[in-house]
Amino acid sequence: MADYWKSQPKKFCDYCKCWIADNRPSVEFHERGKNHKENVARKISEIKQKSLDKAKEEEKASKEFAAMEAAALKAYQEDLKRLGLQSDISEPTISPVTNTVQPTPTANQQKEKKKKKKKKEASKGRWVEGVTADGHCYYYDLVTGASQWEKPEGFQGNLKKTAAKAIWVEGLSEDGYTYYYNTETGESKWEKPDDFIPHGGDVLSSKDSEKLPDTLEDSKSSDSHSDSDDEQKKAGEASAETKKLIIKFKEKNKSTEKRIGPEIQKEKTTPKQNPSNTNEEKPKTPKKSTNPYGEWQEIKQEAESQEEVDLELPSTENECLSSSEAGAGEIKVVFKEKTVSSLGVAADGVAPVFKKRRIENGKSRNLRQRGEDE
């Protein structure tokens, strides 16, 4: 049988990031070591610090949400004061938010809630009448969620229901998300409650607000002859109470534009009674809308003066003169030449002769030669 080599099993330590032999004595010896114990203690402290940081972040987020709710309630109170209405809502005390996990509803509970919701909607009726902030009546469909200005067929007056005080109020957060606020308990949540009834303070779509001009005038003229004085008083009371539930957190200028829009269109629709007076009247200049960034200003370029300015630039005449003077002022250098008449006379009277270097044995002296001893 052939011999073969089998490797010893090894184990990786996650704390020390090293490999050790996978047997009981080696593992116990490594775990009893000082370095391993220090690494384990360091890892535990890191996990503890991370959990503390996470708890601090959650506590900070809960405080920020509580501050947002308080600011929303404060803005709501200011809007009511600006509109001259009294609020029956008392400012709720902000309690620290605890991180509690709500039990998830079972399927049976959800089915029961849906059945109760359907029964409530069937008992209330399909259409509900509401009043906007401007005092205009609109109709809301509980089944489809659609709203319209025209009175639906077979609708019976439901002003008493809209005039009743609602518990839940719909609002918009700073990010544009809708949430629901309980006026009695001060609770707020993102999901739509079961007993929520839409009111005039709810946010309408821009398409519904554009249908205001003509349909409202026709419906008012037709309903004014049929309705009695008592119904008008009830409608006024209902509009006054529903105005209390209006919450406007973003783009407050939109409400003023919506109010100005119908008034301008009414002035256009009214016939001209005295044409002579209108000709005499001067056209009114439209009011300039205030811009937070300021108004545009036209920049006018000033005509540059054509006065000659002395830039003190060098003239060409001076350059020509300087070049001519430089050419004339050049000095020629004369070099002296020295000639050697003779190389000298030796003592014997024989002229010196240049001798060639002798080469030993036909080899030059600058090359290293092997000596005799070598």
Curated annotation (Swiss-Prot):
Residues 121-154, 162-195 form the WW domain. The modification Phosphoserine is found at residues 219, 226, 228. It is found in: Nucleus; Nucleus speckle. Residues 91-126, 188-328 are annotated as: Disordered. Residues 91-109, 315-325 have a biased composition (Polar residues). Gene3D superfamilies: 2.20.70.10, Classic Zinc Finger. A zinc finger (Matrin-type) spans 11-42. CDD domains: WW (cd00201). Its main location: nucleus. Residues 355-373 are annotated as: Interaction with SNRNP200. PROSITE patterns: WW_DOMAIN_1, WW_DOMAIN_2, ZF_MATRIN. GO terms for biological process: mRNA cis splicing, via spliceosome; mRNA splicing, via spliceosome; RNA splicing. Residues 112-121 have a biased composition (Basic residues). Keywords: Metal-binding, mRNA processing, mRNA splicing, Nucleus, Phosphoprotein, Repeat, Spliceosome, Zinc, Zinc-finger. GO terms for molecular function: proline-rich region binding; RNA binding; zinc ion binding. It comes from the Eukaryota. GO terms for cellular component: nuclear speck; nucleus; precatalytic spliceosome; spliceosomal complex; U2-type precatalytic spliceosome. Residues 188-197, 205-270 have a biased composition (Basic and acidic residues). It holds the Pfam family zf-U1. The keyword Metal-binding applies. The WW domain recognizes the proline, glycine and methionine-rich (PGM) motif present in the splicing factors, as well as the Arg/Gly-rich-flanked Pro-rich domains found in several WW domain-binding proteins. Component of the spliceosome B complex. Associated with U2 snRNPs. Binds splicing factors SNRPB, SNRPC and SF1. Interacts via the WW domains with the Pro-rich domains of KHDRBS1/SAM68. Interacts via the WW domains with the Pro-rich domains of WBP11. Interacts with SNRNP200. This is WW domain-binding protein 4. It comes from Rattus norvegicus (Rat).
